[in-house]
Amino acid sequence: MTSKSHWKLLALALVLVVVMVWYSISREDRYIEFFYFPVSEKKEPCFQGEAERQASKIFGNHSREQPIFLQLKDYFWVKTPSAYELPFGTKGSEDLLLRVLAITSYSIPESIQSLECRRCVVVGNGHRLKNSSLGGVINKYDVVIRLNNAPVAGYEGDVGSKTTIRLFYPESAHFDPKIENNPDTLLVLVAFKAMDFHWIETILSDKKRVRKGFWKQPPLIWDVNPKQIRILNPFFMEIAADKLLSLPIQQPRKIKQKPTTGLLAITLALHLCDLVHIAGFGYPDAYNKKQTIHYYEQITLKSMAGSGHNVSQEAVAIKRMLEMGAVKNLTYF
């Protein structure tokens, strides 16, 4: 055998070994170094307006002019016409919305307003938070944004105990606000349909409960302070759908593709904060039928069938934001 042939065989053997090792590692571990930065005990420097500059590249400069939360004065004294129905606008739902805005608030707390530079983390519900030991790190951020019914009690070591903002919708409100939130947590309603306004009104005003019009029965009793409730401006759902996912805003009623609460929360953070980090985002591969998707329950991707969410498309959007430095990742993606 010539020396040239000998080296070719050695090279081929080496390639085979590398391939075997590569595929013996789980996909998540394989990409653990991508779009991930090691967590430091020191706070990362925060530069005022940095997230705004990054957001303008994605959403355009005009998006910062929009209020984060809906206000009564914009619907009571001056009619604010909306071009779209929920979840991308308020067209056709104004009367119900007025009643809700009359008993809730819209202000951003002084504890956030007064910050020279707002350091925020959006905590996803992903399985990769399990055994992450990120709780202490998460608690150090000025603003901690959580999603839906993701629990804190019993998981503090991995997800922290601080909750500044929690986004929810009626069907995801199956959590005890007294246990899973802090006393000053803002509960921000993401309205997908007019019945969502009706539900929150009946809860806060103790009226006859609504039982129909939901894909899952929401709580009939929910002990919350109306002054802690905010209504998210559906503008943020619109730009997340349009600018991040390229979804049509005018859709047939039976289709209704829409962003997940997680992607919506990142969009919100880029408009509220100066520094935005994320943790616990990402789903298993589509072929992985057994991997759980949340850190707190045993459900798989199968549970998202028919949800109107395209998680593959959202992964591309989040990867794009990570690549351009608009957000940084505490876990891996």
Curated annotation (Swiss-Prot):
One biological process term in Gene Ontology: positive regulation of leukocyte tethering or rolling
Disulfide bonds: 120-273
One cellular-component annotation, GO: Golgi cisterna membrane
Keywords: Disulfide bond, Glycoprotein, Glycosyltransferase, Golgi apparatus, Lipid metabolism, Membrane, Signal-anchor, Transferase, Transmembrane, Transmembrane helix
Bilayer topology annotation: Single-pass type II membrane protein
Lumenal-side segments: 27-333
Residues carrying sugar: 61, 131, 310, 329
Superkingdom, taxonomy of origin: Eukaryota
Subcellular location: Golgi apparatus, Golgi stack membrane
GO MF annotation, one: N-acetyllactosaminide alpha-2,3-sialyltransferase activity
EC numbers for this chain: 2.4.3.2, 2.4.3.4, 2.4.3.6
One Pfam family per UniProt: Glyco_transf_29
Pathway in which the depicted protein is active: Protein modification; protein glycosylation; Glycolipid biosynthesis
Cytoplasmic side: 1-8
Record-linked PANTHER family: CMP-N-ACETYLNEURAMINATE-BETA-GALACTOSAMIDE-ALPHA-2,3-SIALYLTRANSFERASE 4, SIALYLTRANSFERASE
Function text: A beta-galactoside alpha2-3 sialyltransferase involved in terminal sialylation of glycoproteins and glycolipids. Catalyzes the transfer of sialic acid (N-acetyl-neuraminic acid; Neu5Ac) from the nucleotide sugar donor CMP-Neu5Ac onto acceptor Galbeta-(1->3)-GalNAc- and Galbeta-(1->4)-GlcNAc-terminated glycoconjugates through an alpha2-3 linkage. Plays a major role in hemostasis. Responsible for sialylation of plasma VWF/von Willebrand factor, preventing its recognition by asialoglycoprotein receptors (ASGPR) and subsequent clearance. Regulates ASGPR-mediated clearance of platelets.
Name of this chain's protein: CMP-N-acetylneuraminate-beta-galactosamide-alpha-2,3-sialyltransferase 4
Organism, as annotated: Rattus norvegicus
